[in-house]
Amino acid sequence: MNCPYCSHPDSKVIDSRDVDDGVRRRRECVVCGQRFTTYERFQPAGLFVVKKDQRREEFNKEKLLSGLRRACEKRPLPAGAVDKVAGDIEAELYNMGKAEIPSTLLGDMVMERLKMLDNIAYVRFASVYREFTDITQLKKVVDNLVNGQDEGIYKGQLSLLPEDKAVPKTRYQRR
């Protein structure tokens, strides 16, 4: 690792710590004595997304997160839910062991998870992903969602009934 201050190629590691997705190392240059931090992360083999027009684009988790955040914007979702969905999708893609995946597979994976997470986010994403040309196509998706809904409320959805009518409250004893 070259020193960022004097560009000398040698440095010694003073401290190493595990961080979320790699190793953080504190280093000291053997020539100028300046200290700096480096991060080492595992970088999996390249994964490419094959677009509808057959272009190939390297998989970008940030682009996936951006689309998810746009669909989930201003929705009452638990903190970290969108990041977890993106992480789960990324892990599943890499676990497939393929070098290329079609963009339709990626889109379907997002749709599947958004449908479980939040109906409004699902419809928002579907309206862009499915490229609706008129309101009747959107209405059909919403009708299918309403008619096919098993539980009435998906995780992350707000109840229409006040909480005291939906579930009887119980008193808890203080410890």
Curated annotation (Swiss-Prot):
Superkingdom to which the source organism belongs: Bacteria
State the InterPro entries in the record: ATP-cone_dom, NrdR-like_N, RNR_NrdR-like
Cofactor(s) of this protein: Zn(2+)
Q: Read off the Pfam families from this record.
A: ATP-cone (PF03477), Zn_ribbon_NrdR (PF22811)
One of this protein's GO BP terms?
A: negative regulation of DNA-templated transcription
Q: Does the keyword Zinc-finger apply?
A: yes
Q: Where is the ATP-cone domain?
A: 47-137
Does the UniProt entry include the keyword Zinc? yes
Q: Which NCBIfam families match?
A: transcriptional regulator NrdR
Report the family membership.
Belongs to the NrdR family.
Q: What HAMAP family has UniProt attached to this entry?
A: NrdR (MF_00440)
- Purpose of the protein: Negatively regulates transcription of bacterial ribonucleotide reductase nrd genes and operons by binding to NrdR-boxes.
| Name the UniProt record assigns to this protein | Transcriptional repressor NrdR
- Supply the source organism for this entry: Dehalococcoides mccartyi (strain CBDB1)
